[in-house]
Amino acid sequence: MSGNGTGRRGRAVVFDYGNVLYAWEPHGALAGRRPARVWEEFVTEGGFPRWNEMADAGVPFGDILAALGRAHPDRPDWAELLADYWRHFPDTLTGPIPGVGAVVDDLLDAGVRLYALTNFNHELFAAFGRPRVPRLERFSGIVVSGRERLTKPDPAVFRVLLERHGLRGADALFVDDAPANIAAAASLGMDTHLFRGAGRLRADLTDRGLLDAPVD
């Protein structure tokens, strides 16, 4: 892979949002409002991951609450808990991932095209997610699962990104913190980086010729 500007302009890096660009801590919505054990019970026994995935897939909030009520008619408090989670959703977004903003800036300055592919409810993303990362306005494209009604690791949502923006899998590096999503991207021929911090990401991007090595 070329490390010069021409080679870089032929490449693209695709970023996940949650816990790659910006920290997402779901318990933050209810911290200080409900006991921790109440939240933990909802996650493990009330099926929070399932309901959250439905929201990420663009299912209307009212429909999700109705489905939760049907699944657990003896626990109306869980529906109230989920409604509170959405009401206080901004408190789940706890800050930029250290060092990643500088990596993004350096990639943009190097002429690398950047994209985002995120599992995120489209309404919550527009209201709270996107405004917290102003650098997204310099990205060449953003695919939000809720708008597409497809979620990672379904390969179909990766195809949406590639086809919509005229990308070849071989020309794109996908950065995500979830191994299942990394595997899905790799199955489509994309290069991948399992995110474990900005330092490792920068080193990998440098090895790939997308960033210059630091000057001693």
Regions found by a protein language model. Name each.
Residues N52-Y85:
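A metal-dependent, Asp-based hydrolase signature
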Residues D16-N19, G58, L107, A116, ...:
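Generic structural signal for small/hydrophobic residues in well-ordered secondary structure
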Residues E25-P26, G99, G197:
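Acidic donor-diphosphate engagement hotspot in glycosyltransferases and nucleotidyltransferases
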